A protein has these predicted regions:
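A mobile, often basic/glycine-rich helix-loop segment
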Residues: 144-162
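Short, positively charged low-complexity motifs
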Residues: 1-3
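Rossmann-like AdoMet
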Residues: 5-134, 139, 157
Length: 162
C-alpha cells in the first residue's frame, strides 16, 4: 500500500484497516493484498528469500527429514499405489523440490507432489510438481504446512490469563 501507513480501528471482534486512500476493508483483505496483491511481498522478484531465510533455504537437511517422514507415512499407509505430498504455502517450491530429490526411487515413482500457493508458479520448477491455489482432495499421504500459518490473517485473537 502506498502513501501513509495504514491505521487500524477496533470494531469489536473485527478489525478494519484503512489504506492510504482512506478506503476501509477487512484485515483479511488488507493482509491478502499486502502478501499476494500485484506488488505484494510474495510476488516481488526477490521473494521472501530476499528478506529472510527459513530452514528450506539454509540446507537440504530439512527436506531430507521431511522425506524420511513421508516414507514413514508411506509405510503406515501400506505403501499405496499413489502417495501424495502436499506442501501448503509452498513459496517458490523449494521444500517440495528438496523432498522429491531426497526420496528413494521406489517411493518417488509413486509420489504425487503438490505445491499449494497463491503466488504464480516459478519458472523452471520441476514438472512433477503440480501447482495449485488450494489443496487437492482427497489426500493419501502427507499434507505438510510448515510455513502456512505464518500467512493466515487472524481477524479475531483471544488471550487468556495463561
Amino acid at each position: 500500500v502506498e502513501g501513509p501507513l495504514p491505521c487500524a480501528l477496533s470494531l469489536g471482534p473485527v478489525t478494519a484497516v484503512a489504506n492510504g486512500a482512506g478506503e476501509w476493508r477487512s484485515w483479511r483483505a488488507a493482509a491478502r493484498e499486502a502478501l499476494y496483491g500485484p506488488r505484494g511481498f510474495y510476488r516481488r522478484p526477490e521473494g521472501p528469500a530476499g528478506h529472510f531465510r527459513t530452514s528450506v533455504h539454509v540446507s537440504a537437511l530439512f527436506a531430507r527429514a521431511v522425506a524420511r517422514l513421508l516414507c514413514r507415512v508411506d509405510a503406515a499407509l501400506g505403501r499405496p499405489a499413489r502417495l501424495d505430498f502436499v506442501d501448503m504455502a509452498a513459496g517458490r517450491g523449494e521444500l517440495v523440490t528438496g523432498v522429491l530429490a531426497a526420496l528413494p526411487a521406489d517411493v518417488a515413482a509413486r509420489t504425487r507432489a503438490y505445491a499449494v500457493e497463491i503466488a504464480a508458479r516459478p519458472e523452471g520448477l520441476d514438472h512433477r510438481i503440480e501447482w495449485l491455489p488450494e489443496p487437492p482432495r482427497p489426500v493419501t499421504g502427507l499434507l505438510f504446512a510448515n510455513e502456512w500459518l505464518d500467512n493466515v490473517p487472524v481477524e479475531v485473537a483471544q488471550t487468556d490469563a495463561a
